[in-house]
């Protein structure tokens, strides 16, 4: 098995940190400190070396330290391709972020070729109650760990969609160019939908196989494209292109694309109770989310033979003793780099004793 882990992390002008350097190894790491000390900021900095906008989905302007116009994060990281240096630079004025791998610029969506990460934050605990977009993005991040090319496909699809919206906003359309863009969207959609369905199958199997103290979840994708593929219908690409053509006038008025895989929803049920997670208590929602994260991590290791970095922000808060004890024992037993934040070690003393301790 190949482990993804940080050897070192250096941040400059990042959030509340002027400068911070951490040396780590392939072991559990516990960050303790008062609220506001910057525990989550460290996890966020690490998460920038994975496709997307980090675990907070923050605006670039919010990441730089107040009064500073730039910030940076550097990491020496054991990647899928071996030991490598990664860096990301953010400039507040230009609102731009650049990422480098061994001093060569790479696109953000290429990071999944090198790294693998799973994270859980308190903000994610409301994902079952939030909008479709948040759940879909959450699930697409899971897909990245099973198929590193998925991030690039999603990025490509979003680019084509923006191009289509720009064309529709014009008074006169170039029908040939619009047709070409819609065909590219349709082709890319099939890959995205198939990746989601394959990952959904992997994840459901992982959840069913994993015996733990958390409720079983039943996963599904609510999307027209995914459903047509599941039904075994022919020429789904042609159907997507035809739908995009049909909705041109409507989408021109709306100023956005109203049909496509960017509208699909990720649905989660409490399997035993047979109710959607959004109708469960907040405690049950957190427990279901933890169950999904554990299953993702376990099956990603099983399927890809790669152990991801696991980032867990305040994961032990509001858990009963039974579940907290299960998690501490589970985390001690697994062989991967795990970052956990807590205000103190109360209730997780054993885990704290067996991890690298960082006090802020």
Curated annotation (Swiss-Prot):
Pfam families in the cross-refs: SMC_N (PF02463)
InterPro entries (UniProt xref): DNA-binding_RecF, DNA-binding_RecF_CS, P-loop_NTPase, RecF/RecN/SMC_N, RecF_2
PROSITE patterns according to UniProt: RECF_2 (PS00618)
GO biological process, one term: SOS response
Main location as per UniProt: cytoplasm
Binding residue positions for ATP: 33-40
UniProt keyword annotations, A-Z: ATP-binding, Cytoplasm, DNA damage, DNA repair, DNA replication, DNA-binding, Nucleotide-binding, SOS response
Domain of life according to the entry: Bacteria
Gene Ontology CC annotations of this record: cytoplasm
GO molecular function, one term: ATP binding
PANTHER family membership: DNA REPLICATION AND REPAIR PROTEIN RECF
Function: The RecF protein is involved in DNA metabolism; it is required for DNA replication and normal SOS inducibility. RecF binds preferentially to single-stranded, linear DNA. It also seems to bind ATP.
Protein name: DNA replication and repair protein RecF
């Amino acid at each position: 098995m190949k482990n993804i882990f940080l050897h070192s992390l250096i941040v400059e002008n990042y959030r509340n940190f002027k400068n911070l350097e951490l040396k780590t190894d392939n072991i559990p790491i516990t960050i303790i400190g008062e609220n506001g000390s910057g525990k989550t900021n460290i996890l966020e900095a690490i998460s920038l070396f994975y496709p997307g906008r980090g675990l907070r989905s923050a605006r670039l302007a919010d990441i730089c330290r107040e009064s500073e116009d730039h910030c940076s994060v550097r990491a020496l990281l054991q990647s899928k391709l071996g030991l490598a240096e990664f860096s990301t630079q953010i400039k507040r004025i230009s609102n731009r972020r650049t990422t480098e791998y061994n001093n060569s610029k790479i696109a953000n969506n290429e990071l999944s070729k090198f790294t693998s990460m799973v994270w859980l934050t308190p903000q994610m605990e409301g994902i079952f109650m939030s909008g479709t977009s948040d759940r879909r993005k959450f699930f697409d991040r899971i897909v990245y760990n099973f198929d590193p090319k998925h991030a690039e496909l999603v990025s490509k699809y979003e680019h084509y969609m923006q191009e289509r919206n720009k064309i529709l906003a014009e008074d006169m359309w170039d029908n040939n160019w619009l047709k070409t863009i819609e065909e590219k969207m349709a082709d890319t959609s099939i890959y995205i939908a198939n990746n989601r369905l394959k990952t959904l199958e992997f994840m459901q199997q992982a959840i069913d196989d994993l015996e733990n103290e958390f409720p079983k979840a039943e996963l599904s994708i609510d999307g027209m494209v995914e459903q047509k593929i599941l039904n075994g219908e022919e020429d789904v690409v042609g159907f997507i292109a035809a739908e995009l053509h049909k909705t041109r006038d409507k989408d021109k008025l709306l100023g956005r694309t109203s049909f496509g895989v960017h509208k699909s929803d990720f649905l989660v049920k409490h399997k035993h109770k047979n109710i959607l997670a959004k109708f469960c208590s907040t405690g049950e929602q957190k427990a279901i989310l933890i169950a999904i994260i554990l299953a993702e991590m376990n099956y990603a290791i099983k399927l890809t033979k790669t152990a991801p970095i696991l980032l867990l922000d305040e994961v032990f808060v509001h858990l009963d003793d039974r579940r907290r004890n299960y998690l501490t024992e589970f985390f001690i037993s697994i062989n991967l780099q795990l970052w956990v934040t807590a205000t103190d070690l109360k209730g997780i003393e054993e885990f704290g004793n067996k991890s690298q301790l960082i006090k802020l």
